Amino acid sequence: MLYLVLFLVPFNSIQITIYDQENFQGKRMEFTSSCPNVSERNFDNVRSLKVECGAWIGYEHTSFCGQQFILERGEYPRWDAWSGSNAYHIERLMSFRPICSANHKESKITIFEKENFIGRQWEICDDYPSLQAMGWFNNEVGSMKIQCGAWVCYQYPGYRGYQYILECDHHGGDYKHWPEWGSHAQTSQIQSIRRIQQ
């Protein structure tokens, strides 16, 4: 009698494939964890990529510094695919890491008028292409508390401009001042916000 035994390999929840040329050409490498410097993996930079599983943050510079770009499941054949309608021309990524706290269904964030969680506040559990159109009184946010999940905040309405990725498991979910949003943060201007897809 012959018995067939199947061994199920756990499905990896995060995976990204990077390429050193546009349109998925050239050298390629797969990752299932953070990469603080693609140069240490014999890449000059990342020019295209595919996110197979999970959500990731790509950075303009090494050591997770510089402009941030949200990388959700899908293909990014060129720089303009990850920068979207961003007016800032960044043709490469030098480091990236997975977002472990993305939980689209249960995401919750509270935005505050001023730094240190002072002033008017608004609890958000949904995507808003324009905070002002939905009732927020100005184009700036002083501080934010991430109760659950991960969010991407944009400088302008319609998910445009600088991207700031905020997670409940970084800074304890507390972002007291706009410089904590990322090393590239230059202003407290936030006009659209959305949950990160896992």
Curated annotation (Swiss-Prot):
The modification S-methylcysteine is found at C65, C100. Residues 14-53, 54-100, 107-148, 149-197 form the Beta/gamma crystallin 'Greek key' domain. It comes from the Eukaryota. Keywords: Eye lens protein, Glutathionylation, Methylation, Repeat. Signal peptide: none annotated. InterPro entries: Beta/Gamma-Crystallin, Beta/gamma_crystallin, G_crystallin-like. GO terms for molecular function: identical protein binding; structural constituent of eye lens. The modification S-glutathionyl cysteine is found at C65, C100. Coiled coil: none annotated. The keyword Repeat applies. One of its GO terms (biological process) is camera-type eye development. SUPFAM superfamilies: gamma-Crystallin-like. Residues 1-13 are annotated as: N-terminal arm. Residues 101-106 are annotated as: Connecting peptide. Crystallins are the dominant structural components of the vertebrate eye lens. Has a two-domain beta-structure, folded into four very similar Greek key motifs. Belongs to the beta/gamma-crystallin family. Homo/heterodimer, or complexes of higher-order. The structure of beta-crystallin oligomers seems to be stabilized through interactions between the N-terminal arms. Interacts with CRYBA1. This is Beta-crystallin A1.
